[in-house]
Amino acid sequence: MSIAKNVGGVPHMLSNIRSSDSYYDLKENVTNTLYKLPGGDHIVERIKKTKSNLKQIILPGQMFECMGISYLGPVNGHDIEKLIKVFHVAKRINGAVIIHVVTHKGHGYKPAERNPAKFHGIGPFDIVTGKELKSSDKPTYSDVFSEKICQLAKKDKSIVAVTAAMPDGTGLNKFSKWFPDRFFDVGIAEEHAVTFSAGMAAGGLKPVFAVYSSFLQRAYDQILHDVCIQHLHVVFAIDRAGLVGSDGETHQGIFDLSFLTSIPNMTVMAPKNGSELSAMLEFALLNFNSPIAIRYPRGQAYETGLEEHNAPIRYGKAEMIIEESDIALVAAGNMLITAQAVREKLKEKGYNITIVNERFIKPVDTDMLDRLSAVSYTHLRAHETLRHL
């Protein structure tokens, strides 16, 4: 059996042979001829066993062959002629076929070849240098998270960080360099990341699982069974929550609230700006001892004009930003910016507007809602999601 990576010309040669029409023509002709001979069935069976044993030594893909799935490859994914030949062969095979195509990420563009992770998802960039054209040098929410978790980890050695193959996107690169023994990249396996975090929490550590909202939904079962029902202290740092723009439709973070708010023992928070994200992360790690999620959007950590509003975070309590009469806008996270814009338009029409920073999406601050109801407000509650509780 092969242990290390296959090297040399033999695997390459056999891959070319198996991916050609002439190989399958010869195979069919020989097999049909042998079946016509006395004892042909036995001969064909012996040849198949010999072939299988040889393939296990020098060819990849045997897991699929053992399941009755034909395997073709590996094939150079940048060679169009070879790919066309392989696809023609695959059409001739009766049954399931796996075509193993090997590509080089960023192939043909040197900046992308040198830094494929950076070019996995990128906005506008200089095509000559490959440098991203940033609309602002101000820190993103991911940057704020990165700085704060490193700051807290310096003081508390029980803090560990987990990612599912996304240290760059989630801002954990710095943590991985500063605290390599407390950083865990589990690969593209969000389900395992959650259960792994649960195990560390059960052992007395303080795991922070940094993940994109759209990928967290893969781990719903583990969040429910392995973390929340067990009441374990796992912090979910949910990046790219809400609409993500240029990241594309597969990355839209609009479903996490729908399932997180339905799970028992789960607390969900959303910061109005970067400084509140820092405060929430500190609260979640140092002043809380149960499952908790902090969801924040893609991009720049907004300067909301509300920086002077920084009341200490108390569990389950909202923050009163502006208290007036007529209409109350209760908003969470980056929807505070929308609430401010709405307030300005309504003020032009003579309305007095109250703005409340919800902070905790779950649990809802019912005391605050009772306070607002006592003044006979018209209430509007704003989240960036498809549905919410």
Question: Where are the model-predicted features located?
Answer:
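Thiamine diphosphate
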Residues: K55-G61, C66-I292, Q300
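Conserved small/polar residues in nucleotide/adenosyl-binding loops
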Residues: T378-H388
